[in-house]
Design a protein with these regions (language model features):
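Extracytoplasmic
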Residues: 17-51, 69-72, 157-158, 240-246
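Hydrophobic core of transmembrane alpha-helices in multi-pass small-molecule transporters
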Residues: 27, 95, 106-122, 232, ...
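Helix-loop-helix hairpin linking two adjacent transmembrane segments in secondary transporters
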Residues: 149-197
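Extracytoplasmic gate region of multi-pass secondary transporters
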Residues: 36-40, 222-275
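Symmetry-related core transmembrane helices of the 12-TM Major Facilitator Superfamily/SLC fold
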Residues: 174-191, 378-396
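C-terminal transmembrane helical hairpin of 12-TM major facilitator-type secondary transporters
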Residues: 264-276, 281-334, 351
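Conserved MFS/SLC helix-loop-helix module at the cytosolic interface between two early adjacent transmembrane helices
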Residues: 67-105, 281
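Intracellular juxtamembrane helix-capping segments at the cytosolic ends
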Residues: 121-135, 326-339
Length: 409
């Protein structure tokens, strides 16, 4: 922290204006995949009856925007984030239109390639890099704010989509939403997404803990690989309630509208608590925040295994949202703390590819296990096991970081 105070800050009122606009754009772009989640049962009924089909489409969207973030992050570094965001908005619209075609392959390509890879992929990872360059002192809080876009989308859109699907069908809902997000995102990007200020050249916040060409005394590739693996294993359980909560409620005889409201509660509490986790991350550091959030997540995930009533599920959903919300931005903050700023444009998208792959895998595993067992209990058990692996990896990194700091103190 002393090193941060030794140079002038780049943070201004414009920094927070940009972060707020980015939050709005992400809340709109992340709305697109939620249509498939809310309409999981009717889409499955029209495409062969297997829930793993729309679950895989959602998984492809998660994987797509993770992989697309690497490619589009490279494009944004050279052509500007405004270009990738405008392109992404148009591609989301195209992908939603293609998904309504009635064929399984159209759903997969529409969600995976257009909505995921070219659409959200052109916004999510490039925005993390872009916004991190507008901040130096409250970077954790800013990253927490923009990373809440997915949770604003999850809190806002499921009840709206549930009513829209019931009234007009999932196809019309996709078509109209695609047009709406283009009409809103393109002007916002054109007006507000200008070049960020130049950051002073300096070491990361934890640079003193690393010798040249090492991170915490380990090879950078090893540390980055461990962080990436940890993000995969933490996002497998993270995705399961988000992707299958409405369907779980329907199976238990709970109204679909209540299931959508439950999802909104989960993601609404995640949005609120993520701002708190950002404040914590600015003080504890990225890895310590990841470890703390992962402990809360595994406890809430275990509670899903033993909860069957509506009030209990609302309570567990809120607890899950409060616990897991700060994990992803804390991973990004850890990357900015541990690695050179010049490497952010590819390390952050690569990290988000890992986390997105974990989200994709978690959503698909839950659907596949449900199709095999006829219940979600095995899926939640698998989620708890994956979370335990995550805790082991992050715990090892935190212990290494603390021992290194103690040795240099």
């Amino acid at each position: 922290m002393h090193e941060r105070m030794a140079v002038p800050s780049v943070e201004t009122r414009s920094s927070w204006t940009v972060a707020t606009v980015v939050l709005v754009i992400l809340a709109l772009s992340f709305g697109a995949p939620w249509i498939t989640i809310i309409a999981l049962k009717p889409i499955a009924a029209e495409l062969g009856g297997l829930r793993s089909v729309p679950a895989l489409a959602t998984a492809l969207a998660w994987t797509g925007f993770g992989a697309g973030g690497i490619v589009m992050g490279y494009v944004a570094e050279r052509a500007g984030v405004r270009t990738t965001v405008i392109l992404g908005a148009v591609m989301i619209c195209v992908g939603l239109a293609l998904s309504t075609g009635g064929k399984t392959w159209q759903l997969y390509v529409g969600q995976g390639l257009f909505v995921g890879f070219l659409g959200v992929g052109g916004m999510n990872a490039p925005f993390y890099v872009y916004v991190s360059r507008w901040f130096d002192r409250r970077r954790g809080s800013a990253l927490a704010l923009i990373s809440s876009g997915a949770y604003v989308a999850g809190a806002l859109w499921p009840p709206i989509f549930e009513r829209a699907v019931a009234y007009a069908g999932w196809r019309q809902t996709m078509l109209y939403y695609g047009l709406f997000e283009v009409i809103v995102i393109v002007p916002l990007a054109a007006v507000f997404l200008r070049s960020p200020p130049e950051l002073p050249l300096r070491l990361g916040a934890l640079g003193a803990l690393s010798a040249p060409n090492t991170v915490m005394g380990w090879p950078p590739s090893l540390v980055f690989g461990l962080i990436g693996a940890a993000s995969i294993f933490c996002c497998i359980p993270m995705a399961m309630p988000q992707a299958h909560l409405p369907a779980l409620c329907s199976d238990l005889g709970i109204l679909v509208s209540h299931g959508a409201a439950m999802l909104s509660v989960l993601l609404g509490t995640a949005f609120v608590s993520r701002q708190f986790w950002g404040w914590v991350a600015d003080r504890m550091g990225g890895l310590n925040t990841v470890l703390t959030g992962s402990i809360f997540q595994i406890l809430a995930m275990a509670a899903f295994m033993f909860t069957q009533d509506e009030i209990g599920l609302f309570t567990v959903s809120a607890a899950f949202g409060l616990g897991f919300a700060g994990i992803i931005p804390a991973y990004v903050l850890a990357i900015r703390e541990l690695f050179p700023a010049a490497e952010a444009y590819w390390r952050i998208p690569a990290l988000l590819l890992c986390s997105g792959s974990g989200m994709a895998l978690g959503g698909w595993i839950a659907g596949a296990l449900y199709d095999h067992f006829g219940t979600y209990a095995p899926a939640f058990a698998a989620g708890v096991a994956a979370n335990a692996v995550n805790l082991a990896i992050v715990g090892a990194l935190v212990l290494r970081q603390r021992s290194r700091a103690a040795r240099l103190a």
